Curated annotation (Swiss-Prot):
One of its GO terms (molecular function) is fructose transmembrane transporter activity. Belongs to the SWEET sugar transporter family. Mediates both low-affinity uptake and efflux of sugar across the vacuolar membrane. Regulates sugars homeostasis in leaves and roots by exporting/importing them through the tonoplast regarding metabolic demand. Acts as a vacuolar hexose transporter, such as glucose (Glc), fructose (Fru), and sucrose (Suc). The lineage of its organism: Eukaryota, Viridiplantae, Streptophyta, Embryophyta, Tracheophyta. It comes from the Eukaryota. Induction: Induced by nitrogen. Repressed by glucose (Glc), fructose (Fru), sucrose (Suc), cold, osmotic stress, and nitrogen starvation. InterPro entries: SWEET, SWEET_rpt. The keyword Transmembrane helix applies. Residues 6-92, 129-212 form the MtN3/slv domain. The gene is SWEET16. Mostly expressed in the cortex of mature roots, and, to a lower extent, in aerial organs such as leaves, stems, and flowers. Mainly present in vascular parenchyma cells, especially in the petiole vasculature, flower stalks and at the base of individual, not fully developed flowers. The keyword Repeat applies. It is a multi-pass membrane protein. This is Bidirectional sugar transporter SWEET16.
Amino acid sequence: MADLSFYVGVIGNVISVLVFLSPVETFWRIVQRRSTEEYECFPYICTLMSSSLWTYYGIVTPGEYLVSTVNGFGALAESIYVLIFLFFVPKSRFLKTVVVVLALNVCFPVIAIAGTRTLFGDANSRSSSMGFICATLNIIMYGSPLSAIKTVVTTRSVQFMPFWLSFFLFLNGAIWGVYALLLHDMFLLVPNGMGFFLGIMQLLIYAYYRNAEPIVEDEEGLIPNQPLLA
C-alpha cells in the first residue's frame, strides 16, 4: 500500500505541475493583446495563496518534501501570472487588484504562519493547524474558476473560462483524492474530493456552452473590459 501511495503521489505531482502550467496559453494571449480582457484574476490569486501555504506545510511536516517542492513551483508560476495581470490590467482596476493581492498573498500568509507558530508550541500541532488552513484554501482554489461562470453565461461563450485549467483541476482532485484515501488523510481528502466534483461541474458547463456563438468584439478587435474581480 505504501508503494502504491508513492506512485499515486508521483502521478499527483505531475498533474499538479500541469495544473500550474495550464494557464500559459491564457497569459500568452494577454501578453499578445496587451489586455486582460474579461479574464478573471481571482483564481490565480487564490492558487498563489494556497501554494505558498502548502509549501510551508511541506517544509514543517516530516516526509512531505514532495508537497513543498511541487507547491513551491506552483507559487513561482502563479506569481508570474499575477504580475502579468497587474501589468496589463486597466488602470481603473489596478488599485483594487493590488489591494486583493497584498491582502491574500502577503498579509494572510504572514498572519497564518506567525499565528500557528505563536499559538502552537509543538511541531505536530503547528503542522495540523496549517494542514487545516491549507485544506480550506484548497477548496477555495478548486472553486475559484467558478467566478468565470457568470461571464460564460452572460456572453454564452467559454472563451474566458480556460478549458485546460478546469480539466487539470478535475484530474488533480481525482488523483489526490485517491492518494488521500490510501493514506487516510482527511486534510487531502476533503478539498480534493470537492475539487473533483467542482471540476466535473466546470467541465459540464464548458460542454454546454462550447458551441455558442462567439462574443462580439469592439471596433479595435478587443472585448470590452469588465471588472476583473467580482
